[in-house]
Each structure stands twice: as structure tokens, then as C-alpha cells.
């Protein structure tokens, strides 16, 4: 299985049989090296919350590829009005799909979509714990540091994607504390340097993670990691 980092919080998981895209902020993402038209067929889209830099191009991709969108119940209800297939879930719920299982994990953040100038409530933000071919991937979504992360240690996570940009999410120092609680085999920092307000240094984060005896890969957009 390959995990391709597309910048900001967008990650494409390729199993060989299915392509699973997380938080598809593609066309308007200044750090993404491709456009939606360059993506392979996407079978499933996982959306952590409704903000534009995560919901992104979900509807366009789902319409193009007849993808199933996995997200929280409220956001699922809102975007299903566009005629796309959705699978609603909620925090703590786990479901087995044809590619593997998905569990929604807590995230400390907000979630809304914009209708004109008005933000519309879009359910609880979440992270995803994904199990494919006996490998476990955790995508934290947008979140601050939370003690709930201690519960993830028992999952023996192979690959964790953690935000480090600060301001809207935890900074790199809080992300290091998250690593101590989760203790994944490999960590990849996300959600940083897309804009000045979330500027962070992944080299410092990597150094601190490696002090814990763990692996950190600060992937550049367009780079991938094999599991």
C-alpha cells in the first residue's frame, strides 16, 4: 500500500485495488502538485470536517468517479444534496468497507460549510483510524492536543498523519506530545506552511520525534511512503 501526500492535509491511499482520498483540497491548494484532473479514479473519499481546505473538491471528484464519501452524519446530509453517494458515521463508530475498516476518532476543532456569507453547522470534526491489509493508518484531521489520543496507543498504529501548523491546530510541540501518546511506527507531519499563519518547521518536528526512537518522514507534496 502506498500513501501519497498531496500537501496541506490531503492524502491518497492506494491499495492496488482501491484508491482512498482523504481531505481532497486539490485545485485551490497552493501546495498541491496536481489538479483534480490528474487524479486516478477515486473509489472512496474520507472528509474530516466541513472547512473548505478539507472538504475541498469532494463533490467534483465524487460526481466524476461515483465515489462514496465517508464523513460525519451532518456533513454527509449536507453534501448528499449534490447527488453523490455518502456513508454517514459518527465519533467512535467503526465500519468495514470493501477496502478495510474505518473508525472515526475525536478531533478538537470546528466544522462548518459556507452558504453565501453564512457558516452552516457541519457536525463534529473527526480523525480517521483506517485499517487496510493489516496496516493501521491514523489521520488526525484538524485538532488540538487531546488526552483521547492516549487511547490510540493500543491500536499499534503503523503510520500517523499529524498537523503541526499551530493557530488552527496543534503546533509542532503539541504534536510531539501527541506522538508520545500514540507511539506510531512512522509519523508524517501535515497541515503546515500552506499559508503564513500555519508556518512551522518540519525539520524540528522530525528531530524531536527521532529523539523518541521513532521514525518521522517530512514528506514534500507529491512524495509517498510505502507500507
Swiss-Prot record:
<dbReference type="InterPro" id="IPR050114">
    <property type="entry name" value="UPF0173_UPF0282_UlaG_hydrolase"/>
</dbReference>
<comment type="similarity">
    <text>Belongs to the UPF0173 family.</text>
</comment>
<keyword id="KW-0378">Hydrolase</keyword>
<dbReference type="Pfam" id="PF12706">
    <property type="entry name" value="Lactamase_B_2"/>
</dbReference>
<dbReference type="InterPro" id="IPR022877">
    <property type="entry name" value="UPF0173"/>
</dbReference>
<dbReference type="InterPro" id="IPR001279">
    <property type="entry name" value="Metallo-B-lactamas"/>
</dbReference>
<protein>
    <recommendedName>
        <fullName>UPF0173 metal-dependent hydrolase Tlet_1100</fullName>
    </recommendedName>
</protein>
<dbReference type="GO" id="GO:0016787">
    <property type="term" value="F:hydrolase activity"/>
</dbReference>
<dbReference type="InterPro" id="IPR036866">
    <property type="entry name" value="RibonucZ/Hydroxyglut_hydro"/>
</dbReference>
